[in-house]
A protein has these predicted regions:
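Active-site loop segments of alpha/beta catalytic cores
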Residues: 1-39, 94, 100-103, 121-267
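Segments that shape or occlude catalytic/ligand-binding pockets
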Residues: 31-77
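Long, low-complexity intrinsically disordered regulatory regions enriched in P/S/T/G and acidic residues
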Residues: 76-80, 95-96
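Short loop/turn motifs at secondary-structure junctions and domain boundaries
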Residues: 82-85
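Generic recognition of long tandem-repeat/solenoid scaffolds
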Residues: 87-95
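Extended Gly/Ser/Thr-rich low-complexity repeat segments
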Residues: 101-115
Length: 267
């Protein structure tokens, strides 16, 4: 069984020479076949996902380590889910500030799901979301980290992802792209207040990471020029990233970026 962790460490420290770590996203193909009850082809039939990676001699980008981060909320924030129909689920968060809901729809061809209704649709919803994020904290769970390590072992180095920066999180987590763009234009003062709360929330997340055993830390944003023009990038994403970079770094941790570009990265 090959130790990919050592090569992973050597690469991020610039000590690997010309060696390359192969990390294909085979897990997506594996999960789709599992969802559809389609056996793996020979000679991989019956293998677990870990066994498949080992048989191919490749490493996994182990996103599972994000489960080692536990969200902490006060008792006056209550969450529950309820079925809407066979394919849809309603998610509810009740707070002293009010209640917000979201609806997600499952895919018919894989384990994925997507928002059909976003958490925040107007300023009243946004005030509830601000209350939620202002009162959240984070805790590293060594127990959950060890569970993931038992699954993947030395197949790859565990990494953790910072939350998306303010405007990116607005698009991906809270309002969706269309709702987020309208909110930036229609209620800029409320959005600015929300972003201050969100940044403080993210700082608590980052401070939690600094005290954890994670060595490899991703800045965790996707940059899509179609929804993030230079004006918004320069106003929100760049200052937020610079702020994160100014937080104290530690010699036992390495930081890296990952971006999906919707345009020529040289532009």
């Amino acid at each position: 069984m090959k130790n990919h962790i050592d090569l992973n460490r050597a690469i991020i420290r610039g000590e690997a020479g010309r060696k390359v770590l192969w990390q294909p996203r085979i897990i997506c193909w594996y999960d789709d076949r599992k969802f559809n009850n389609t056996p793996l082809p020979a000679p991989y039939t019956g293998m677990s996902i870990r066994e498949l990676y080992e048989a191919l001699g490749c490493s996994n980008r182990i996103y599972d380590y994000n489960y080692a981060v536990e969200l902490i909320e006060p008792s006056d924030i209550k969450r529950w889910t309820e079925p809407v129909d066979e394919m849809r689920t309603r998610h509810v968060v009740q707070t002293p500030q009010g209640t917000i809901t979201a609806i997600t729809r499952r895919n018919s061809s894989n384990y994925g799901e997507y928002f059909e209704k976003w958490w925040v649709e107007d300023q009243e919803d946004l005030e509830v979301q601000m209350y939620i994020e202002a009162n959240q904290d984070y805790r590293f769970s060594q127990e959950k980290y060890d569970e993931v390590y038992r699954l993947w072992g030395e197949n790859g180095l565990g990494s953790i992802y910072f939350p998306r920066t303010t405007v990116q999180s607005l698009y991906h987590d809270t309002m969706g792209i269309e709702g987020g763009v309208y909110a930036l234009m229609d209620m800029p003062d409320a959005i600015e207040e929300y972003f201050k709360i969100k940044q403080a929330n993210h700082d608590r997340f980052i401070n939690m990471i600094r005290s954890s055993c994670f060595e490899w830390i991703n800045f965790g944003d996707n940059i899509h020029c179609g929804t993030l023009p230079p004006s918004l990038f320069e106003k929100y994403v760049l200052p937020d990233s610079l702020h994160r970079n100014e937080l104290p770094h530690q010699k036992d941790k390495r930081y890296y970026t990952f971006a999906h570009w919707a345009a020529d990265p040289r532009s």
